[in-house]
């Protein structure tokens, strides 16, 4: 599956869930919510699919691109 770009709509559940501009929702991997809780709406993201709904999500708008593990749970 190809990488895709997305925009962040909102961070939910203290960083444990991301909702993207296409209304998909992603559960953030254990330990990564301390990173995503600081992400802001409209941040540009790159999604690198790794299979079976799993992906690496990179925030392209942070000083050093933050990369977290996530699993698609809706959309």
In which residue ranges do the predicted regions lie?
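Short, basic/aromatic beta-hairpin or loop at an interaction surface
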Residues: 11-26
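Short, surface-exposed beta-strand-loop junctions and turns on beta-sheet-rich folds
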Residues: 24-27, 34, 63-65
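Short peripheral tails and domain-boundary helices/loops at the edges of structured domains
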Residues: 60-75
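Short, Lys/Arg- and Gly-enriched loop/turn segments at beta-strand edges
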Residues: 52-60
